[in-house]
Each structure stands twice: as C-alpha cells, then as structure tokens.
C-alpha cells in the first residue's frame, strides 16, 4: 500500500496537523482512542495510507509531531485526539526558536533534528511501500520555517526518490504575528524551491477573507481558519485514502501539476464553503461546485487568479456524481475562461473523483491551481523583506546564530528569480517566440 508519513512542525504546523487528524479520523471512523467504530468497509480499505494497525482494531497515525518548545505539544496531547498519537512520536525541545529562522535551522533545531529523523525513520520502516512525506508548518515563525526546512532537506538526503509535499502557511500583511516574518518566509521559500515536490500555499489573509465574506463570521478564530485548512488537506488527500473512479496519488499529482521543477507552489481552493455551525444541507449541483471551485473568493492564498494564468490545475470531486457531468463542467469552465489558461499546455486541467463525500456534505470539490498569480504572494513578501534588509533591521538576531548576510542576499535573489519565472511563463504564448524562451531553460 502506498503509505504517507505526516510531519507537523512548530506551533502552527501542530495546530493545523492535529485538526487534520481529527478530520480524517472522523472520515475513517477512528475514535480518539484509535479504535475503529466506523460502519463501512470503504473506510478501512486504504486506511494504512495514514495509519498503522497497532493491534486488533487499533489504528495509530503515521505522524511525527515536532516543536522546539513543549507548549503546543501539551495542548495537542490534552486535546480531543491527543491519545491517538504514539507517545514516542512527540519530539520536542525546551528552548523554543523565538520566531527566529536561524535558531530553527542552524542552532536549536539542528540539535533536535537527529531525534526527529530517528522517529521518521522508524515510521518509514514500518511502511510497506512508502509513497512520500507531507509536512504542515508555517513560514513566518522559527520552528516550522527554520526547522521544517531543515527536516525537509535531511529527509530528502535519505529518501531522494520519495515525494515531498508541504502545506505551508504563508505570512500575510494583514494578519501578522511577528515583525521578522518576511525574513523567515524568504529564507524558507529559498529552501522550498529546491527541496519540495509540491507546496500548497495557505494564507491567513485569504482564510480570514473567506471567514468574513463567505462564512459570515464576525470574529474568526484560528479554530475557524484551521477548519478551512483541514477541509482542504482532507480534500487533497482523498484520492489517496478512498477508492474512486479516477484516482491520483502524490506522484501523479506532482507529474500533472509541475511543468517546471521550481514552479511547484499551488493555490488550494474548496467548495462548497460553509461555516462550522451550519454545514449546509441544501443540495448543491456539479455546475455550482465547479463554478465555486474556480472562484477567486474560494482560494486559500491571497492572490487573484484573474491576475495571472493557470499553468495547470486539478480538481478533486467527492461524493456520488456523474463523471460525465463533471467532465462537461470542467471543459465548460476551460472554454469560457480560456484566456486564464496558458495555451501551450493542452488539457492542463486534471480531474479526480472519489465516491465518499466529507462529513456533513453530499458532495464537495477541492481545487489545486498552479497559477502564475501566486507571484503576487512572493512579491509581497519580497517587498517587505527588502524594506527591512536594506536597513539591516533585526539582522543581528540571525547573524548572532551564525548566519551570514550572504545567505539573505541569496534567498532574496532566489525569490525574485521565482517571481520573474512565473511572469515569463504568464506572458509566453504557444507560438515560436515562446519556444526560444524555453531553449534558455
């Protein structure tokens, strides 16, 4: 079976990660103690993608929980599903990274990383045919960004041919936690560009907008935001966990979605969007789902897809629906909005269908877009980075941990290169002028 090892690092990663486990445990009929209490064979058919069968009828997540301070771990452990995880898989330090990327990547994190890798290795060895890894983390803090990227590169060394996926929460200007977020994020992106196969960019600002505008929540909490993220994560991983008419796995996803190795930053979306309190009971149709899916308001990254073009996109539909109708609607969208899709990748929209809808919904759709508009997000971070870096503000926190200014300059130019690559492909046309641009690749 194609197993996935899940890693969650830092405060944000652990909060999103534990929410994700709540959602998928619920979908698979696993109760908080790991007992199977479900009612359908389909729940167990591919349960071993994410769970180890520990004893008769007891399932344990293939999850590794990492943090440089015990606080968040304690709240996960005392949370609703805290007893689900293997106690040995909680790996934490005592010192904290203090929102400092250098601490997570070079000093504090580097001391803890071997302990984490031991646990990862143990999880990987208990698999039959490991498909890859997924990491949940944020890019604005110290642990998730610094130590998260360190873990990625270490795992990459040891398992070079396995897929590496990340769900990365990108800092946003409106919802800021720390002043050094642009530094941490830029240093992280510098790593992600080289070391991951796909990165789902989740953006607090976009999540807040969805909560305000669509879900009509007046004061969204992080709980509400994480609920949205977990819905998306559950959608992206559906095909791996349930049988369906058209299945995908992490590698197929990467093959279909990544036209050039560096351009693997995706915008996720979800439909229908409903608030936690009223997950609606009105019937939704396939055309509505498809429409909503591609709607800018439903994107979990604060970029407007109408400002760029889709290089590739994928939609994962869940629920009992007619394949024919799904295909028709997807074609319909592409024909109507053809200017938003690059013309030099024919049929660049992939569809997958899984028969089992999420809890409380008749059908849902998860959208994954590789759009050149994601450059807005990197531009935004880059501008903030440059503003501070020009004055060398806050740099001493990083150089004090042994970092060199050179590394900042490199990260900055790598991110700017990424932005111009997106721009280049946005403007490229299918005719021969574009062909020359590719020869230079």
UniProtKB/Swiss-Prot annotation:
Phenotype upon gene inactivation: Defective touch receptor neuron synaptic transmission with reduced levels of rab-3 at synapses, conferring touch insensitivity. Irregular touch receptor neuron shape. The heterozygous mutant, but not the null mutant, rescues the touch sensitivity defect in the mec-15 single mutant.
Main localization (coarse): cytoplasm
Binding residue positions for Mg(2+): 69
Cofactor(s) essential for the protein: Mg(2+)
Domain of life (superkingdom): Eukaryota
Keywords: Cytoplasm, Cytoskeleton, GTP-binding, Magnesium, Metal-binding, Microtubule, Nucleotide-binding
Compartmental location: Cytoplasm, Cytoskeleton
A GO CC term assigned to this protein in UniProt: neuronal cell body
InterPro entries, alphabetized: Beta-tubulin_BS, Beta_tubulin, Tub_FtsZ_C, Tubulin, Tubulin/FtsZ-like_C, Tubulin/FtsZ_2-layer-sand-dom, Tubulin/FtsZ_GTPase_sf, Tubulin_C
Tissues expressing this chain: Expressed primarily in touch receptor neurons.
UniProt cross-references to CDD domains, sorted A to Z: beta_tubulin
UniProt: GTP binding residues: 11, 69, 138, 142-144, 204, 226
Gene Ontology molecular function, alphabetical: GTP binding; GTPase activity; metal ion binding; structural constituent of cytoskeleton
GO biological process annotation, one example: mitotic cell cycle
Subunit structure: Dimer of alpha and beta chains. A typical microtubule is a hollow water-filled tube with an outer diameter of 25 nm and an inner diameter of 15 nM. Alpha-beta heterodimers associate head-to-tail to form protofilaments running lengthwise along the microtubule wall with the beta-tubulin subunit facing the microtubule plus end conferring a structural polarity. Microtubules usually have 13 protofilaments but different protofilament numbers can be found in some organisms and specialized cells.
Family from the record: Belongs to the tubulin family.
Functional description taken from the UniProt entry: TTubulin is the major constituent of microtubules, a cylinder consisting of laterally associated linear protofilaments composed of alpha- and beta-tubulin heterodimers. Microtubules grow by the addition of GTP-tubulin dimers to the microtubule end, where a stabilizing cap forms. Below the cap, tubulin dimers are in GDP-bound state, owing to GTPase activity of alpha-tubulin. Plays a role in mechanosensory transduction (touch sensitivity).
Official protein name in the record: Tubulin beta-1 chain
UniProt source species: Caenorhabditis elegans
Gene name per UniProt: mec-7
